[in-house]
């Protein structure tokens, strides 16, 4: 499907990327849409010991297999189905299971580093950065990681201060300059989301 529209959605952890993504998908009813979460593409670490895997910095660009993501995107854009990897967060490596993806009218690539890789950026028709206050982002991360991932509040805060925050400032925040659209206040900014989805609907209808 050479006329596939590719949308990139980036922003820090807890910024509201998922909310924005869901709003876009909801407003694109009538078009087929696929979501490729960048988290699917954490690198395989089966060659490392479990202890070594625990030391992986998942908030660094090197943690992601962008080559495979780019290859999958090219195949989908050319009308070919792909098998997308999944990640086992318990064993900290790639799972043996994959997810079958068919070509779609619209493909959304969502992740903290969605705009970091130039080759990936150049494939995108629309680049979005979800910009949310750091205090709100850490609060959302606290709720998510303690409730959904069973982590202690202390471990989440320590990880944020020692890894997440410095990686955000070094690698994620600078990608804001590549965005066509910046959405302040994340998913709660209904006006910005409405304007953005209207633009995307117009673009998709022309493809």
UniProtKB/Swiss-Prot annotation:
PANTHER family: URIDINE KINASE (PTHR10285)
Primary location recorded for the protein, binned into one broad class: cytoplasm
Localization, UniProt: Cytoplasm
Protein name, per record: Uridine kinase
Keyword Kinase tagged: yes
Keywords, ordered alphabetically: ATP-binding, Cytoplasm, Kinase, Nucleotide-binding, Transferase
GO cellular component: cytoplasm
Coiled-coil portions: none
Residues annotated for ATP binding in this entry: 11-18
Catalytic activity: uridine + ATP = UMP + ADP + H(+); cytidine + ATP = CMP + ADP + H(+)
Family statement: Belongs to the uridine kinase family.
GO biological process, one term: CTP salvage
Species annotation: Staphylococcus haemolyticus (strain JCSC1435)
Recorded name of the encoding gene: udk
Associated pathway: Pyrimidine metabolism; CTP biosynthesis via salvage pathway; CTP from cytidine: step 1/3; Pyrimidine metabolism; UMP biosynthesis via salvage pathway; UMP from uridine: step 1/1
One protein family per Pfam: PRK
EC supergroup of this enzyme: transferase
GO function term, MF aspect, one: cytidine kinase activity
Protein's UniProt keywords contain RNA-binding: no
Assigned EC number: 2.7.1.48
NCBIfam families the record matches: PRK05480.1, udk
